[in-house]
């Protein structure tokens, strides 16, 4: 007979193993969320294309000394810059009035304005049954944008009148872009690298390739393919330093309070020196600017499967907790 207040022999092992079980389960869950690569498919039959995404975890991380990089939620960033092939196939699938075309095939979509990049993002949303991220209008040969109301606007991390709260895909804000490029990962106060190649030493300049610690810059002949644009960031993105400059969603002053504000652009291009690839360097460009040296990547909320896994994890832990009582 078991004395009052004592654990039975059957209960003892679970009582001792439960904390370890929870720790291992959540560690495995975190690893899955942060390291998995997902491919989303878009376009119509014969013109389908995919965009690979990596998960950006460590929600609630601290900002860098530059004041950028803090993001209070998990999200996904495209592994690669958006390719010209994706633009071409989106146009063939119904997207209109986007004229990028400095390069071809799997080279980056360049010579593209902020508005055109935003229109591509809207296509990703509306063609998959989601809400458009940006309130865009194309009239008389040019794009314009209206701000969302405070009720319609994105509010995670602060009110963002550029982005709709129900959008699934969007251009990365400056903080989202910065974190994906420079944050070391592995916790909420891990710090930042100076370059988007998981290093504070200047990357090795290459014309193409995927070697760790390399980037396409320093007056190489031209751009590389988006999936051969240098080494990876800690989260697994490629080409955030060199190849082409990348539009950020954010206004240069960070307010996103006027549609006419200049937009931030980061990362440098294939002809730049290493200092332009650094976390400390950013430029203010007009949203209508189109040059062969500028492109973009996209971001999104986590896949529903991520939330489902989180709910399953919570339910499992709750069930185990009740079993111990």
Which residues are covered by each model-predicted region?
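Boundary at the C-terminal end of the N-terminal hydrophobic targeting segment
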Residues: 35-41, 303
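Functional-site microenvironments in short loops/helix caps that host divalent-cation chemistry
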Residues: 49-50, 118-278
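Short, structured beta-strand segments at or near domain termini in extracellular proteins/domains
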Residues: 291-300
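Bacterial N-terminal signal peptides
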Residues: 22-34
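Short, charged juxtamembrane terminal tails flanking transmembrane helices
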Residues: 323-325
């Amino acid at each position: 007979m078991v004395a009052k207040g004592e654990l039975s022999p059957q209960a003892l092992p679970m009582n001792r193993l439960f904390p370890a079980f929870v720790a291992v389960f959540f560690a495995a869950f975190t690893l899955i969320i942060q390291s998995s690569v997902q491919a989303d498919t878009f376009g119509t039959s014969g013109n389908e294309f995919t965009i690979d995404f990596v998960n950006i975890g460590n929600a609630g991380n601290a900002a860098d000394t530059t004041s950028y990089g803090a993001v209070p939620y998990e999200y996904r960033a495209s592994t690669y810059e958006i390719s010209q092939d994706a633009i071409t196939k989106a146009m063939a699938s119904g997207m209109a009035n986007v004229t990028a075309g400095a390069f071809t095939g799997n080279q980056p979509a360049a010579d593209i304005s902020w508005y055109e990049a935003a229109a591509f993002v809207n296509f990703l949303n509306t063609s998959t049954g989601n809400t458009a991220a940006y309130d865009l209008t194309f009239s008389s040969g040019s794009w314009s944008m209206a701000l969302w109301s405070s009720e319609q606007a994105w509010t995670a991390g602060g009110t963002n009148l550029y982005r709709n709260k129900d959008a699934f895909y969007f251009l990365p804000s400056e903080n989202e872009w910065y974190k994906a490029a420079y944050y070391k990962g592995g916790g909420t106060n891990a710090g930042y690298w100076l370059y988007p190649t998981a290093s504070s030493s200047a990357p090795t300049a290459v014309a193409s390739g995927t070697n760790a610690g390399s980037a396409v810059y320093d007056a190489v002949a031209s751009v590389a393919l988006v999936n051969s644009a240098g080494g990876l960031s800690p989260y697994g993105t490629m080409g955030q330093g060199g190849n082409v400059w990348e539009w950020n969603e954010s206004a240069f002053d960070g307010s996103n309070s006027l549609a006419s504000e200049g937009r931030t652009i980061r990362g440098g291009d294939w002809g730049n020196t290493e200092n332009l690839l650094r976390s400390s360097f950013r430029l203010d460009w007009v949203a209508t600017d189109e040059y062969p040296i500028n492109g973009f990547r996209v971001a999104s909320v986590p896949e529903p499967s991520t939330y489902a896994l989180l709910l399953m994890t919570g339910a499992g832990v709750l069930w185990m907790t009740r079993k111990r009582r």
